[in-house]
């Protein structure tokens, strides 16, 4: 795997990752995102419906926590997760945890990390971890690490222990990797831990960079708001310690404003769980991300973001409110609201996704109220395509030297 940077602007890195995949013929532009999946399948979508989406990332994101309990089945199959999931030509990145599902804390030890699947807790030693990777056969995988510590709320002693454990796990995994010929083509991604302690973050980054890893995961930064400068400064400090020629990953950061903050601090790759979370709320992404809008559509886009279209509309009534609505962002509209019952326009004017070309807000509202499975399918198609096009706009803005203009455009939609 090789990362070639073509431009660095305001900390943001534009480039291409090449020479990866089983045949070494795949490429991935950065900044970019991965295709989020549940047990190696895009949520709500079949392989055929996935093909209708434009700009699908070259790398599919699978999670060990959702697949570990199926290890025996995959061992008997003996062909790896790619063929098992019907995606034989896909490139897979395997993370330890699902970024959507919070993990209970207090269960990691010096010998094992606890994963949480549908059947409960699974203790994962380094031996079991490498055994699972041999069965899954991903192209990239995150190293086992003690990632319970996040910025805020942990003692210095616990944070130091997290870094120490993670480095021990990394060394053990590297040793085990060298003993298994079938894992030689796989790329190990080292995890940078350290909570909110700058010295521990830097120690973790420096020590991990000394090992033969193919990239770095900045772990434990999910849930940090875009305006939290103290925490964001940790990201800048960590990326400054990492080699320029290896990609930097992050999990659980998906809001457009947060993505741009992290990109401008040197992060390259994100997961795409955010559009899935938006879909689960019965919402559709409608934010504008064109930093150089066509004058003919500028008035239309302005209308899209008018007061009556925003989530914060005081008069908006949701027919069946639920707890998820508290998580809504200014970048989406909730199609459960009564005002969409007779709105026969597309989810987003100008969007070329299958849903917007063929169906209306009123129809999706009806599907949500009737609890039809098609609602999730149509929303997932739209939200994935809009999110993937957002990253395309980020790369275009970097090429044009307009990344700050794009960040300002996104910031205005968050105000």
Curated annotation (Swiss-Prot):
Heterodimer of a catalytic subunit qtrt1 and an accessory subunit qtrt2. Keywords: Cytoplasm, Membrane, Metal-binding, Mitochondrion, Mitochondrion outer membrane, tRNA processing, Zinc. One of its GO terms (molecular function) is protein heterodimerization activity. One of its GO terms (biological process) is tRNA-guanine transglycosylation. The gene is qtrt2. Binds 1 zinc ion per subunit. Zn(2+) binds at residues 351, 353, 356, 382. The keyword Flavoprotein does not apply. Its cofactor is Zn(2+). The keyword Electron transport does not apply. HAMAP family: QTRT2. InterPro entries: QTRTD1, Queuine_tRNA-ribosyltrfase, TGT-like_sf, tRNA_ribo_trans-like. It is found in: Cytoplasm; Mitochondrion outer membrane. Non-catalytic subunit of the queuine tRNA-ribosyltransferase (TGT) that catalyzes the base-exchange of a guanine (G) residue with queuine (Q) at position 34 (anticodon wobble position) in tRNAs with GU(N) anticodons (tRNA-Asp, -Asn, -His and -Tyr), resulting in the hypermodified nucleoside queuosine (7-(((4,5-cis-dihydroxy-2-cyclopenten-1-yl)amino)methyl)-7-deazaguanosine). NCBIfam families: tgt_general (TIGR00449). This is Queuine tRNA-ribosyltransferase accessory subunit 2. GO terms for cellular component: cytoplasm; mitochondrial outer membrane; mitochondrion. Its main location: cytoplasm. The lineage of its organism: Eukaryota, Metazoa, Chordata, Craniata, Vertebrata. Belongs to the queuine tRNA-ribosyltransferase family. QTRT2 subfamily. It is a peripheral membrane protein. It comes from Xenopus laevis (African clawed frog).
